[in-house]
């Protein structure tokens, strides 16, 4: 009817109990002990008054620390698993010492899931076994943290054992005092006290058994710690062997996979935490509504308790003069009506309490109880204990009323016994008055304490609302940072893909460059062979020209002889006086001379034919050489176009490098912001620690401090991961810049080769011009000789040969004009290519200047960040070694960055000076372009930025 046992069992069903562990064996004992205090005596016993006094004197709420569990909870030996726990570590339960009476139910200790923290860390170790050969340091840290947590839990269990022993001693002393008081004052209650002693002995045995179980559990935890240490040793040995086997084969690939897996795992944990936070918000709102309803019910209960106390005071004290039976019956009727009304109210309140406890139990199974509900639950339990004591008093009064009715209506003879009992009441009324006064004083104290607690509750609720708002702001910032981290991760993935594409494109270009160099070598060999062929042909032409000159001299001699002979013939004709013999001799001589002339003519015709054949062969060879020269020029144009494409690709790579530098800057700025937020969170943690020192009795601040610690550690991990990702991207950029420098060197080599090739072509063209001029001179001499011979020779064959020679000369002139036009076109294309090269160099200088400016800006930003961090650490005014070491490390990094900034400024000044010299040289080069074309090109092409500048590109802070 009164439901005292139900309230206790609902309290004992601890909402924070782990689902893996069994229920505590103390529950059955509490069920048996809660119903053992039924009202059997006729009057309000002295033992009940003393128990009420002890309860109100010692029933203040006691809070354990955040990680302290109660040692009376029992676990079987095989229930400790190392899987991932779903529940968090529960805050410490409330302990209430309720005096020596078993009639007042003591509230149950909340079951704390001691192994949830070890389960959580065990799950971490289980997940880290999969990548143990990849991340040994992470696994060691996790294992060390689990070992430290287990040792801390062992220490806490030992401390709780000591506390339980102290409680046992206190209960023994209270039992002894209560027994002495019973023996001295109330001998009729000895039988009842024997039963109570038996129950207390049973409780003592249960407590001893629980101590034994906790001791066994401590031993079991020590064994598990030893097993974990053995596992650590074996895993370290395995890790050492795997590291020796794997070596340095795929370190970068593993780190990339690890970071991606860590990122995915962190993302999954973040989603899970977001869901839990959403559920927690909903449950917090519902709990606040429940707390308001409970406050209203508590106010109603306070009023009912005050009424009951007034009734007890009016009922407990008998009047000095005996009144009539009518007045007594009227008082009994009023008391019965009040009791019935109070019973109805109590039933309603108990139903509401049961409903609230069930909802609290259901909510607390989903999440750990907040500190506010714990404080309210302690207040509710105190009120329940008061209500239970008042119920017992009411039952005693009802029994007394029934006895009075029976004695008053049936037995008039027993009035004398009642009068004796009233005298006994009178004798002990003074004692009861003093006790009631003490109870009133204690009630006033408790009311003042309740008011103080209400003010504390209001302040704590205000602080809780502020903390909730701050937590919501932090959560919003967390979501924004996570979104930014996701965006940065997508950008990093896109950069990786683009880097891979650029690397493949660079490999293709290197292959093309190698093919071009090989083709260039083959073409150079062919050109050398052509040069040798040309030299051989020139030697043959020289030999033939010498032969022609010798034949021409012979012809001249023969012409002279002919003229002499003609003169002689004329002289002979004039001398008609010569004899016929002389004429015969002369005719013979003439015939011989004619034969000689015919032979000479035949020999001349043969020589002319041979010369014409050689000229035709030379023409054919000249055509072949021109075709080869045209093919070489086409290949040269193709190679120059490929060079232009390579330069455009190099400029695109430089622009991509600039974009990557800008993205790296944004990443560094994001990292700086995260570091600043971490420093802010650390400052908030320090403030929270100071608040915790001021109010250690409030567990809500401890929860918030823990959450802030977790958030700070999470931000530190995120900062470390982002810093590692930035370092990896910087290394990739370094490699890309080195590859770009190699490509620039290859382009310079190709430019020098093209310049040499163009010089060789210019030399060949000059030699061809010289040879053509010599051929022109020789042809002019031949034409003059032919014209001279035209006067002496009238043969048609000679005229035909002269016409052929004239046609050949015209053809050679046309070929010379064509070669001149080609030379002009090649010179024009060379000038255009030089202008394009100059533009490319100017663009490259601009890009280098922009890169140096960006590096200087990034270094200045990094230096300002280091200054800000140093100022924050100095303002924190903490003289710890870690902060001093951090300040020293930041100063060293700042000095290194300043040194890098000096180097960058020196490089920029060098580049500006080189640009000035190059512009000055370029002006002189254009001024003497027509006179000194090839050396100007060589000097211009050799001017490139030093490789030190290329090596010093990038910020590796």
Swiss-Prot record:
Residues 1-13 have a biased composition (Polar residues). Residues 140-917 form a coiled coil. Gene3D superfamilies: 1.10.287.1490. The modification Phosphoserine is found at residues 65, 666. Residues 1-44, 918-957 are annotated as: Disordered. Keywords: Cell projection, Coiled coil, Cytoplasm, Cytoskeleton, Phosphoprotein, Synapse. GO terms for molecular function: structural constituent of presynaptic active zone. One of its GO terms (cellular component) is GABA-ergic synapse. Residues 922-943 have a biased composition (Basic residues). It is found in: Cytoplasm; Synapse; Presynaptic active zone; Cytoplasm, Cytoskeleton. The keyword Phosphoprotein applies. Residues 948-957 have a biased composition (Acidic residues). Its main location: cytoplasm. The keyword Phosphoprotein applies. Residues 14-25 have a biased composition (Low complexity). GO terms for biological process: maintenance of presynaptic active zone structure; regulation of calcium-dependent activation of synaptic vesicle fusion; regulation of presynaptic cytosolic calcium ion concentration; synaptic vesicle priming. Pfam families: Cast. Thought to be involved in the organization of the cytomatrix at the nerve terminals active zone (CAZ) which regulates neurotransmitter release. Seems to act together with BSN. May recruit liprin-alpha proteins to the CAZ. Interacts with BSN, ERC1, PPFIA1, PPFIA2, PPFIA3 and PPFIA4. Interacts through its C-terminus with the PDZ domain of RIMS1. Part of a complex consisting of ERC2, RIMS1 and UNC13A. This is ERC protein 2. The lineage of its organism: Eukaryota, Metazoa, Chordata, Craniata, Vertebrata.
């Amino acid at each position: 009817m009164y439901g005292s046992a139900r309230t206790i069992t609902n309290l004992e069903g601890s909402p924070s109990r782990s689902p893996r562990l069994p229920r505590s064996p103390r529950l059955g004992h509490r069920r048996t002990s809660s119903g053992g205090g039924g009202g059997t005596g006729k009057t309000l016993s002295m033992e009940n008054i003393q128990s009420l006094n002890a309860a109100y004197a010692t029933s203040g709420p006691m809070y354990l620390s955040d990680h302290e569990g109660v040692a009376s909870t029992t676990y079987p030996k095989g229930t400790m698993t190392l899987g991932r726990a779903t529940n968090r570590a529960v805050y410490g339960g409330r302990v209430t010492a309720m005096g020596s009476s078993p009639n007042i139910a003591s509230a149950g200790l909340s079951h704390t899931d001691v192994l949830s923290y070890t389960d959580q860390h065990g799950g971490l170790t289980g997940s880290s076994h999969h990548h143990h050969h990849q991340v040994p340091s992470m696994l060691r840290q996790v294992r060390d943290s689990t070992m430290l947590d287990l040792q801390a839990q062992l220490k806490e269990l030992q401390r709780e054992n000591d506390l339980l022993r102290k409680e046992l001693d206190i209960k023994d002393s209270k039992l002894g005092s209560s027994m002495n008081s019973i023996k001295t004052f109330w001998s009729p209650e000895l039988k009842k006290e024997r039963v109570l002693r038996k129950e207390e002995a049973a409780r003592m045995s249960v407590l001893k058994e629980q101590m034994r179980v906790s001791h066994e559990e401590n031993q079991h935890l020590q064994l598990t710690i030893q097993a974990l240490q053995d596992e650590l040793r074996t895993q370290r040995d395995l890790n050492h062997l795997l590291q020796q086997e794997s070596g340095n084969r795929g370190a970068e690939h593993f780190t990339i996979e690890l970071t991606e897996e860590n990122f995915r795992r962190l993302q999954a944990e973040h989603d899970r935490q977001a869901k839990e936070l959403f559920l927690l918000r909903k449950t917090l709102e519902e709990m606040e509504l429940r707390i308001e309803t409970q406050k209203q019910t508590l106010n109603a209960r306070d009023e009912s308790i005050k009424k009951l106390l007034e009734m007890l005071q009016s009922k407990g004290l008998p009047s000095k003069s005996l009144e009539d039976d009518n007045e007594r019956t009227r008082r009994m009727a009023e008391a019965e009506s009040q009791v019935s009304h109070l019973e109805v109210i109590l039933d309603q309140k108990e139903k509401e309490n049961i409903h609230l406890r069930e909802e609290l139990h259901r909510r607390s199974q989903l999440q750990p109880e907040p500190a506010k509900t714990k404080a309210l639950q302690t207040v509710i339990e105190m009120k329940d204990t008061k209500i239970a004591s008042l119920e017992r008093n009411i039952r005693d009064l009802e029994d007394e009323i029934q006895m009075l009715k029976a004695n008053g209506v049936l037995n008039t003879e027993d009035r004398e016994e009642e009068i004796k009992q009233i005298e006994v009441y009178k004798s002990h009324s003074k004692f009861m008055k003093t006790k009631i006064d003490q109870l009133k004083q204690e009630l006033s104290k408790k009311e003042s304490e309740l008011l103080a607690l209400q003010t504390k509750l209001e302040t704590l609720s205000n602080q809780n609302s502020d903390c909730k708002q701050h937590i919501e702001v932090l959560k919003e910032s967390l979501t924004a940072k996570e979104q930014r981290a996701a965006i940065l991760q997508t950008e990093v993935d896109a950069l990786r893909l683009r880097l891979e594409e650029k690397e493949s494109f660079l490999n293709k270009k290197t292959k093309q460059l190698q093919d071009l160099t090989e083709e260039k070598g083959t073409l150079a060999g062919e050109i050398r062979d052509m040069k040798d062929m040309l030299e051989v042909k020139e030697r043959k032409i020289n030999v033939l020209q010498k032969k022609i000159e010798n034949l021409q001299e012979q012809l001249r001699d023969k012409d002279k002889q002919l003229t002499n002979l003609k003169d002689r013939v004329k002289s002979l004709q004039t001398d008609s006086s010569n004899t016929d013999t002389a004429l015969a001799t002369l005719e013979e001589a003439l015939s011989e001379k004619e034969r000689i002339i015919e032979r000479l003519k035949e020999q001349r015709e043969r020589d002319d034919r041979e010369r014409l054949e050689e000229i035709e062969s030379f023409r054919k060879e000249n055509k072949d050489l021109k075709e080869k020269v045209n093919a070489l020029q086409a290949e040269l144009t193709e190679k120059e176009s490929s060079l232009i494409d390579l330069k455009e690709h190099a400029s695109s790579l430089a622009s991509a490098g600039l974009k990557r530098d800008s993205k790296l800057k944004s990443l560094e700025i994001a990292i700086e912001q995260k570091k600043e937020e971490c420093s802010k969170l650390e400052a908030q943690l320090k403030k929270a620690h100071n608040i915790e020192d001021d109010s250690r009795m409030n567990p809500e601040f401890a929860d918030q401090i823990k959450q802030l610690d977790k958030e700070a550690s999470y931000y530190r991990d995120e900062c470390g991961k982002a810093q590692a990702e930035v370092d990896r991207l910087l290394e990739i950029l370094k490699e890309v810049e080195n590859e770009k420098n190699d490509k620039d060197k290859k382009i310079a080599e190709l430019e020098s080769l093209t310049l040499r090739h163009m010089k060789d072509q210019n030399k060949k063209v000059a030699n061809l011009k010289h040879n053509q001029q010599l051929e022109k001179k020789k042809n002019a001499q031949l034409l003059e000789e032919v014209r001279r011979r035209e006067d002496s020779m009238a043969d048609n064959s000679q005229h035909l040969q002269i016409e052929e020679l004239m046609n050949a000369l015209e053809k050679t002139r046309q070929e010379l004009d064509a070669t001149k036009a080609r030379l002009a076109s090649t010179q024009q294309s060379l000038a255009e290519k030089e202008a394009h090269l100059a533009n490319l160099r100017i663009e490259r200088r601009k890009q280098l200047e922009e890169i140096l400016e960006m590096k200087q800006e990034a270094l200045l930003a990094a230096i300002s960040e280091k200054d800000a961090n140093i100022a924050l650490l100095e303002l924190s005014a903490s003289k710890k070694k870690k902060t001093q070491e951090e300040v020293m490390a930041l100063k060293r990094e700042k000095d290194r960055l300043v040194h890098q900034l000096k180097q960058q400024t020196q490089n920029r000044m060098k580049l500006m000076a080189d640009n000035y010299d190059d512009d000055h040289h370029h002006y002189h080069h254009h001024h003497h372009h027509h006179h000194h074309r090839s050396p100007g090109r060589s000097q211009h092409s050799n001017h490139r930025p030093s490789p030190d500048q290329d090596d010093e590109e990038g910020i590796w802070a």
